[in-house]
């Protein structure tokens, strides 16, 4: 039986979309009280033109990097597939990754560098030797899954893995939705003012986070898609009302205009202005949308180092 080419194409596109979504196994490892999730489809991103550009900028000849790869057998350029990070908003974060890990080799390399290796429920936990009393740890749950965070967070993730718990709810649903159409993404269903309260060191900025506008943002999400011809950035903020969404659009447009007004002051401001110029803000009911498309050449230029300022020669005027 001959299958129509349109059916084959549709199936491939659907499969590609499904593959792009956050891995359920990684999602189930995050803490149940997580407030913000973010992730990167590393393998997909690296395959894009921009991903190849970033790889070309890596210092692969660095002695420390080569020593790390030789000792562990792990090369992040092609052994890392996906990263998922979660935080509960209380200075506790957990990072989980999917890739190819040579467990015994990595553990041996860590021990050789002085790291403490302890066993918890059949899984070895490696604790950093950098500082006395350090609580930064990493555990390899199997040859394809890694967990990193403070020791208690890593142990809790191991507990969830063994218990077979699942992460569900509105944040999980939003994460699946956003990650399915982006290579790098974030999602939160917590009001921004709640999450930022007391987290900003500057008292003036901390006060701004509690302003009426940010209090109106009930949840937010966004992402970056690396395409064959450039990069697309998108985001949305769900507010309390249609009026709040439009007010947020107006504020974002005003801030973008301020950035553009200062573009001639220094090269960094000029780079920011190019982003502001490409940004489009719209309101659809209580939701504010951001879209931004940048061609490959422009996005690469944004990541190029700034040229050093010319030095004064010290020649006196006559």
Positions of the model-derived regions?
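Structural boundary/hinge residues at secondary-structure and domain interfaces
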Residues: 20-133, 174-213, 250-278, 300-318
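Short cationic amphipathic helices and targeting signals
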Residues: 36-38, 91-99, 144-149, 233-237, ...
């Amino acid at each position: 039986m001959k299958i129509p080419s349109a059916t084959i194409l549709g199936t491939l596109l659907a499969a590609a979309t499904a593959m792009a979504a956050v891995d359920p196994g990684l999602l189930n490892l995050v803490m149940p009280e997580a407030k913000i999730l973010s992730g990167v489809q590393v393998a997909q991103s690296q395959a894009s033109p921009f991903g190849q550009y970033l790889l070309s900028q890596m210092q692969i000849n660095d002695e420390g990097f080569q020593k790390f790869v030789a000792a562990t057998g792990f090369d992040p350029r092609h052994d890392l597939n996906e990263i998922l990070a979660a935080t509960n908003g209380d200075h506790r974060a957990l990072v989980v990754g999917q890739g190819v890990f040579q467990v015994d080799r990595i553990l041996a390399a860590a021990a050789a560098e002085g790291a403490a290796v302890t066993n918890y429920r059949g899984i070895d936990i490696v604790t950093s030797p950098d500082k006395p009393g350090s609580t930064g740890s990493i555990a390899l749950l199997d040859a394809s899954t890694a967990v990193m965070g403070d020791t208690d967070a890593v142990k809790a993730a191991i507990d969830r893995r063994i218990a077979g718990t699942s992460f569900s709810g509105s944040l999980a649903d939003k994460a699946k939705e956003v990650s399915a159409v982006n290579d790098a993404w974030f999602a939160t269903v917590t009001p921004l003012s709640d999450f930022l309260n007391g987290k900003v060191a500057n008292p003036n900025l901390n006060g701004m986070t509690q302003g009426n506008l940010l209090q109106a943002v009930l949840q937010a999400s966004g992402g970056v898609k690396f395409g064959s011809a450039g990069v697309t950035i998108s985001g949305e903020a769900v507010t309390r009302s249609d009026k709040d969404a439009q007010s947020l659009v107006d504020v974002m447009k005003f801030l973008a205009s301020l950035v553009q007004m200062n573009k001639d002051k220094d090269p960094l401001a000029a780079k920011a202005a190019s982003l502001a110029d490409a940004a489009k803000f719209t309101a659809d009911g209580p939701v504010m949308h951001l879209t931004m498309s940048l061609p490959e050449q422009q996005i690469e230029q944004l990541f190029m180092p700034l040229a050093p300022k010319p030095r004064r020669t010290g020649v006196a005027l006559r």
